[in-house]
Curated annotation (Swiss-Prot):
GO molecular function per UniProt: exodeoxyribonuclease VII activity; nucleic acid binding
Keyword field contains Hydrolase: yes
Family: Belongs to the XseA family.
Source superkingdom: Bacteria
Protein name: Exodeoxyribonuclease 7 large subunit
Lineage, opening ranks: Bacteria, Pseudomonadati, Pseudomonadota, Betaproteobacteria, Nitrosomonadales
Residue ranges of the TM segments: none
Subunit structure: Heterooligomer composed of large and small subunits.
EC assignment: 3.1.11.6
Compartments, record wording: Cytoplasm
Length: 448
């Protein structure tokens, strides 16, 4: 269908060639969206500018194509004449020559569309099953005791991983589980390596890696059996497959994805300097805690020492108290004696007024007074004897007196008086206090 507004009537305007070509280019670019075209590459020319020029052809026709440098630089493979490809292109017109051409945005080998569809279908199905869910991801141990590597031997990827591990933590043991990572048997070999690592259970984390390549080269990591083996593995897995722009099904299922094999090694192994810095930090924290604890204990010791009374002082206080009790007792007996005397005198006076035989009553009163005097003297002497005994008993309890009799007092390293052999152990230090001086000793044997 032709829009009459696009081409004015010939009688009114005569088009110049450049105007016509520009107008046709605009119509083509605005009319046709990006589309995929398949064909065979021919006459491929790579210019110093980095741009590629070639033709796409089939059995019946061909079309000129251009792929600019900022587009082709991201290809991980090099097209050749005769290669069957699929190109995502914008239809345009090269105005200078009036040539119809395709500006290529993306280029892939023929058949990769099927691979991408297979990739997306499997990705969607596994995602719906929950294999990509974060809650199923295992934590990567911060300080693994041993690391396992699943990859092909004698490859740049393996060398990069080993070099990185050696640089970050040279003392970390490494186990290599060799498996081809490209080809028809690669997927089953990777699954077998994962099973062996699980059975041997000798590593804390696994690195699954390989270098860059095309989608076909990396396809083993898009196989369902590999994805399910990774999901079932009880050992945390870090993937480092291809380059940063490469994503595989294995990356989505793994516990952690790194952009490259080197990046996987950096995620799996801690850096020695970081460990040293962390150890220094905790050493400093521990030292501060110990110093604060010692300071608190010293303050507590000073407080207890201030409150602690020497045994000699306690005996002196007891003697003073005993002397006070003695004085109070004497004062009480004196008062009681005065009361008794007053009563006797009152009784004597009453007798004198009531009975004529004053002499008999007086003799009886004198006898009672003498008996009372003897009783008082006897009681005082008895109390005096008890007081002397108490003083002697207190004197025997004085640690200095005990030490002067040839005994000694042994203290533990914590300052406690040693009363039981279970308070100490072989190798402990003790302090022995004598009547004069002290000594330190080391325990070589204890008997329970």
């Amino acid at each position: 269908m032709t829009d009459n507004n696009l081409f004015p009537e010939p009688k009114k305007i005569v088009w110049r060639v450049s105007e016509l070509n520009r107008h046709v280019r605009v119509i083509l670019e605005q009319t046709f969206p990006l589309l995929w075209v398949s064909g065979e590459i021919s006459n491929l020319k790579r210019y110093p500018s980095g741009h590629w020029y070639f033709s796409l052809k089939d059995d019946n026709a061909q079309v000129r194509c251009v792929m600019f440098r900022h587009k082709n630089m991201y290809l991980d493979w090099m097209p050749q004449d005769g290669a069957q490809v699929e190109a995502q292109a914008l239809i345009t017109l090269y105005e200078a020559r009036g040539e119809f051409q395709l500006t290529i945005e993306r280029l892939r080998r023929a058949g990769l569309g099927v691979l991408f569809e297979t990739f997306e279908r499997l990705k969607t199905r596994l995602q719906q099953e929950g294999l990509f869910n974060p809650e199923y991801k295992q934590l990567i141990p911060p300080y693994p005791q041993q690391i396992g590597i699943i990859t092909s031997t004698n490859t740049a990827a393996l060398r990069d991983v080993l070099t990185t591990l050696q640089r970050r933590l040279p003392s970390l043991p490494v186990v290599i589980y060799p498996a081809p990572v490209q080809g028809k048997e690669a997927a089953s070999a990777i699954v077998t390596a994962l099973q062996i690592a699980t059975q041997r259970s000798e590593c804390d984390v696994l690195i699954l890696c390989r270098g860059g390549g095309s989608i076909e080269d990396l396809w083993a990591f898009n196989e369902e059996i590999v994805a399910r083996a990774i999901a079932a593995c009880p050992i945390p897995i870090v993937t480092g497959i291809g380059h940063e722009t490469d994503f595989t099904i294995a990356d989505f299922v793994a516990d952690m994805r790194a952009p490259t094999p080197t990046g996987a090694a950096q995620l799996a192994a801690p850096d020695r300097q970081d460990i040293l810095h962390r150890l220094q930090y905790w050493q400093h924290r521990l030292q501060q805690a110990i110093e604060r604890n010692i300071e608190r204990r010293m303050q507590t010791t000073d407080l207890l020492a201030h409150r602690l009374v020497h045994p000699g002082e306690r005996i002196r206080y007891q003697l003073i108290h005993l002397s006070q009790l003695h004085n109070r007792l004497l004062h009480a007996w004196s008062r009681q004696l005065e009361v008794c005397k007053w009563r006797i005198e009152a009784f004597r006076r009453r007798i004198q007024f009531t009975k004529p035989d004053i002499n008999t009553g007086k003799r009886y009163q004198q006898e009672l007074a003498a008996r009372l005097q003897r009783a008082m003297v006897y009681r005082l002497e008895s109390l005096q004897v008890q007081l002397i005994r108490q003083q002697q008993h207190l004197a025997h309890l004085d640690p200095k007196a005990v030490l002067e009799r040839g005994y000694s007092i042994t203290y533990t390293a914590g300052g406690e008086i040693l009363q039981d052999s279970q308070q100490i152990h072989t190798g402990d230090n003790v302090q022995i206090v004598f009547a004069k001086g002290s000594a330190k000793a080391n325990i070589t044997e204890t008997n329970k």
